């Protein structure tokens, strides 16, 4: 059964981690609500990978500098014909989340929501009811 067909049992929100400043990174603390649903190491690896991808997106380098210069020279019309480094990495993040949902989370009755859909404030994990276990409600 696909999780989208089961009723929603709850949601877990993984908050941003501001301990290293305002760069986009999320807490790797394992939420108790996911106990017996997903392996702690897999969860932490998923969040660490997301944190690394967001760090890559925000990294300043030659490409970012060149994009900025081209943007100024073309009154930002260059972005009509090319993607920025940041946009490319955000696509990588979306693809990674989709893969993780298919391989790890969906079979466990969970669904990761792309943080960009929540304004990069939280990672939302939807928990679907397990039809095999009676909920007592």
Curated annotation (Swiss-Prot):
Q: Which InterPro entries match?
A: Golgin_A_7/ERF4, Ras_palmitoyltransferase
UniProt keywords (A-Z) are:
Golgi apparatus, Lipoprotein, Membrane, Palmitate
* Bilayer topology term: Lipid-anchor
Q: Where in the cell is it found?
A: Golgi apparatus membrane
A GO cellular component annotation here is: Golgi membrane
| Residues bearing a lipid moiety (S-palmitoyl cysteine) | 69, 72
Subunit-level organization: Interacts with GOLGA3. Interacts with ZDHHC9.
Name this polypeptide is given: Golgin subfamily A member 7
Q: Which organism is it from?
A: Rattus norvegicus
């Amino acid at each position: 059964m696909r999780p989208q067909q089961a009723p929603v049992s709850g949601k877990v929100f993984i908050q941003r981690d501001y301990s290293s400043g305002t760069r986009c990174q999320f807490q790797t603390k394992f939420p108790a609500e996911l106990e017996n649903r997903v392996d702690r190491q897999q969860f932490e690896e998923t969040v660490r990978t997301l944190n690394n991808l967001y760090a890559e997106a925000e990294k300043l380098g030659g490409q970012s500098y060149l994009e900025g210069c081209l943007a100024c020279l073309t009154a930002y019309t260059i972005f009509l014909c090319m993607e920025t480094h940041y946009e490319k990495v955000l696509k990588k993040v979306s693809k990674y989340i989709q893969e993780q949902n298919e391989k790890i989370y969906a079979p466990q009755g969970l669904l990761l929501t792309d943080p960009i859909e929540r304004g990069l404030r939280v990672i939302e994990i939807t928990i679907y009811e397990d039809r095999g276990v009676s909920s007592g409600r």
